[in-house]
Amino acid sequence: MTSDSANQAPASVAYPKNIKSFVKRAGRTTTGQAKAFEVWGPQFLLKYAPETLNMVKAFGMNGQDATIGPVIFEIGFGMGEATAHIAKVRPSDFFLCCEVHEPGVGALLKRIGEQDIHNIRILQHDAVEVIDNMLPLASLDGVHISFQTLGTSHVTTNADLFKHL
């Protein structure tokens, strides 16, 4: 196998280029963020599973006729300040948020709990895998991409990411 063929995906793959929607950053989880994982994690953190996500159940709506409002998929919310703000001012929208940075997830969980926000759910997982494996077709009403995109290669990554949607 040559080095050229090692970088090529099989022809049967829908998205032949491997795309990562994140870069793991160094950082420490504070005591408050760790406590937020314990206290609010069970209610607001969703576990990644390679199966279609039931949005109604994910957002805690019960009953046969339960529905939810518009679903916004947010990729890379950082420390969650903007996410918490927009979710609070748009209470009829539902925010499904992906972030891999543990301190950021903890910070958003802390904000959710302290500000009594109920329309956010968090997946601490790669957004590309979530898009490919968990999101039902036509289930999103909007997408926010909030991670830092400096340089040409990141612009290309964003374009490739949108191909998944």
Label every model-predicted segment.
Residues T2-F73, E81-R90:
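S-adenosyl-L-methionine
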Residues V89, E114, L140, D160-K163:
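Glycine-rich, phosphate-binding/catalytic loops in enzymes
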Residues D93-F94, A138, L150:
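Secondary-structure boundary/capping positions in well-ordered alpha/beta enzyme cores
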Residues L109-K110, L135-P136, T156-N158:
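Short amphipathic alpha-helical segments
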Residues N133-G142:
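A short acidic, Gly/Pro-enriched loop at the edge of an enzyme's catalytic core
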Residues S146:
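Residues lining the SAM
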Residues M61-D132:
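SAM cofactor-binding core of SAM-dependent methyltransferases
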Residues G151-L165:
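A short, conserved alpha-helix within the catalytic core of class I
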